[in-house]
Design a protein with these regions (language model features):
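P-loop NTPase nucleotide-binding/switch module
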Residues: 8-25
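Conserved ATP-binding N-box helix of the HATPase_c
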Residues: 34-58, 122
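ATP-lid-like helix-loop hinge signature
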Residues: 48-78
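GHKL-type ATPase core
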Residues: 76, 90, 101-194
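Acidic ATP/Mg2+-coordinating residue in the GHKL
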Residues: 81
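A short glycine-centered beta->alpha linker in the GHKL/HATPase_c
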Residues: 85-87
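Mobile ATP-lid/nucleotide-binding loop of the nucleotide-binding subdomain
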Residues: 94-98
Length: 195
């Protein structure tokens, strides 16, 4: 019997939290195609609201959903806000590492506390379309916006980054964006949503 217990114990392995959620997407709200799009919108908007609230900024949030591929039911979700933005050094952790956030030890209940939401969206987008999520962030103390395409290495629970750079962020009216965040990802969804 002792040999059996030792053999069984030697077969036990620890799995990364991101690897667990990769196999159990329904825990993150990605259990159906329609709900996946709703979850992605909710997570992005919740993050925008939280950031604006914490920075004491009246939120101005734009959400755009565009159908990209009719045959594969791929849609592109783009959100933009006027929040404080995210410093370049923090972008990869915010979008590419599960259980990373600022609300774990908050006393007051907030929209999100787990540090899972937006990274779950990045992961789901990557798993369903093979594409990374494009992030553009501008903070008030910098003259240009940081840009990067973020994916998730689920085995290591770490971000994968490509196309890093900086660019000026000009608004449609010709003014320069002072601060804010823009996220663009693609996901698979049903061809229609019922109101």
């Amino acid at each position: 019997m002792a040999g059996t217990a030792e053999r069984m114990a030697s077969n036990q392995k620890q799995v990364a939290i991101s690897e667990f959620f990769e196999k159990n997407k329904h825990f993150l709200g990605f259990d159906s195609l329609t709900r996946s799009l709703i979850t992605a919108v909710k997570e992005a908007v919740d993050n925008s609201l939280d950031a604006c609230e914490e920075a004491r900024i009246l939120p101005d949030i734009r959400v755009k959903i565009t159908k990209i591929d009719d045959k594969k039911n791929i849609v592109e979700l783009q959100t933009e806000d006027n929040g404080p933005g995210i410093p370049k050094r923090s972008i990869e952790k915010v979008f590419g590492q599960l259980l990373f956030g600022s609300r774990f030890h908050a006393i007051r209940q907030s929209r999100g506390q787990q540090g899972i939401g937006i990274t779950g969206v990045v992961m789901y987008s990557q798993l369903t379309t093979g594409r990374k999520t494009h992030v553009r962030s501008k903070i008030a103390t910098e003259t240009s916006a940081a840009i990067v395409d973020i994916g998730l290495d689920t085995r290591k629970n770490k971000a994968t980054k490509t196309n890093e750079g900086r660019e000026l962020w000009e608004l449609p009216n010709g003014e320069m964006k002072e601060h804010g965040l823009e996220i663009t990802c693609r996901t698979v969804s049903y061809t229609h949503l019922r109101a």
